[in-house]
Amino acid sequence: MPRTKVFYFIPNLQQGGPEGQILELINRLPQRFEAVLCVYHGDNVFWGNRCPPGQPAHDLGVRSMNMAALDRLTDILRREKPAIVHSYRDKANFWARWAASRAGVPITITGCRNRMMGLRYLATEWFLQRKSKVILANSIGVKQELVRWARVRDDKVRVIYNLLDVDFFRPPTAAERADARTRWQLAPGTRALLLPGRIGIQKHQLGLLAAMRTLARRGKWPQDAVVLFAGRARDKLTSALVRRFARSPGLASAVRFLDAVKDIRSLYWASDLLVMPSLYEGLANAALEGCAAGLPAILSHAANVDAIVQPGATGWEVPTLRHAPLVEALEAALATTPERLAEMGRAGRAHVTARFAPRKDHVLDQMVAVYDELLTAD
């Protein structure tokens, strides 16, 4: 029986949740599907260890799309003759729909995985939605933004959460935690607060630093606490501001920059608390993974729209872009006993497992069901 070809399109494979998710999906697809991956460019591949042999199959060789790249993409689709085009990220969605329409691909699925979409994208989405059989969102918040601001039909958007491997992202044994802390040079007794994600406006590292400074000025930032920023620079200006702020008196010894971390699980294992005061998110993949690994978490409301954290039981939720509540949550977390934090972490793992990964292939089965539904209807 011939395999069904699915053509995946994403700008690149640099550090980021969508990039990891698309490769996880390709790796776990049933054998009756044949995956073909195409990127704008193959530079600075962060997820190389997850790439199946021969992927990405196509590299357009551009940093940003243009008409010549659109022609190349259209030609590739005509040669590959996929049954489905499935694109990830806003700009890729625009070009994928255009190329798929030109090439006569019968089914196009577009994936929106973050909020605060560009104004141009929102402005064109109302018209372009007719080129997508289905628009997949990974968060209730993303769907709400598409329906409210882009005027996409409610029934056109379906929410399928991120793939979460709770067998891999699990709490460490005592020996694994000790090894992880040694690897990340955390001395005995040091409390590690982890903010994973690219350095930029979205993840709001500046907000966390401001809250730390407030506690330090009040004499309430503990000498044994350190914040770990794990992520590449998203943009030069914000990254420079974050690093300059981190050198402020009272903060310099309490902040470490780790750049992009490939073995993120070991960093979860080494840490004591996850902190993500994001200004906007789709479904925060790092929050899911960290909680599955047994970390209690402080999340902004923007990062917790899909109820990753249960306030008071598995962590803290703070209003987005509010300084005082973040200060209060940090102070409360730092005053919480290790035993209570561990209890919250165990409850957090149970919660995210039940909500986002109740069985091994829960999300994969939902994705495959969408493919099968559209193939049957076509």
Question: Across the structure, where does each feature detected by a protein language model lie?
Answer:
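N-terminal strand-loop element at the rim of the active site
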Residues: 8-71, 76, 156
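Conserved acidic donor-binding segment of nucleotide-sugar-dependent glycosyltransferases
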Residues: 311-312, 316-324, 332-338
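A conserved, positively charged/aromatic
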Residues: 105-140, 144-151
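Short His-centered aromatic/hydrophobic patch
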Residues: 87-93
